[in-house]
Amino acid sequence: MKNIFTIDTEDWYHANFEDGLFTNDSNVISTVEKNIDRYLELFSENDVKATFFVLGFVVEQHPQMIKKIAAEGHEIASHGYGHQLVYKQTKKEFREDVYKSKGLIEDLIGCEVLGYRAPSWSIIEESLWALDILEELGFKYNSAIFPTKNFLYGIPYAPRSAHNATV
């Protein structure tokens, strides 16, 4: 499957600004379903398929939405469990976060999860160790490094095209 559209499937409160607004409080008003429905309608009207990088937290809160995305032929990939920045996690925390997310998705949709995107593209030079963990967990590709540098993420010298792409 070759998709040119990707959607980070998270809610408004998962944004990362310095310490962020992040919360895993299920009592916060969610807008993710309404927004994803808009994308699905647009993609359907234009016969487009996309990759949806979904948080494990969103899988738990909106399982029917995730099933609908998959049923419409879109790829479901991991965005981690709780939208924690990779470079703020230990190796152990990162492994547990991604393992949990991958398992939740695979159990729900019955398909192997091949891809991963770090929250806020937070694999930076200091957290390249995460790539080894992703490989150990069976991921075939990642979309987790942004080839520029800003206040939150990026590796300016990173390749701007697929590197050793096999999927």
Language model features with spans:
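Active-site-adjacent pocket scaffolds in enzyme catalytic domains
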Residues: 107, 111-112, 118-167
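Hydrophobic residues in well-ordered beta-strands that form the structural core
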Residues: 52, 78, 141-143
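Short, electropositive alpha-helical surface patch
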Residues: 59-76, 128-140
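Histidine-centered catalytic micro-motifs
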Residues: 76-83
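Phosphate/nucleotide-binding catalytic core
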Residues: 55, 101, 105, 117-119
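Short catalytic/ligand-binding loop motif for oxyanion handling, primarily in non-cytosolic enzymes
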Residues: 13-15, 60-62, 84-87, 123-127, ...
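Alpha-helical scaffold elements lining the catalytic groove of polysaccharide deacetylases
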Residues: 33, 85-107, 166
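Active-site beta->alpha N-cap acidic-glycine motif
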Residues: 1-72, 117
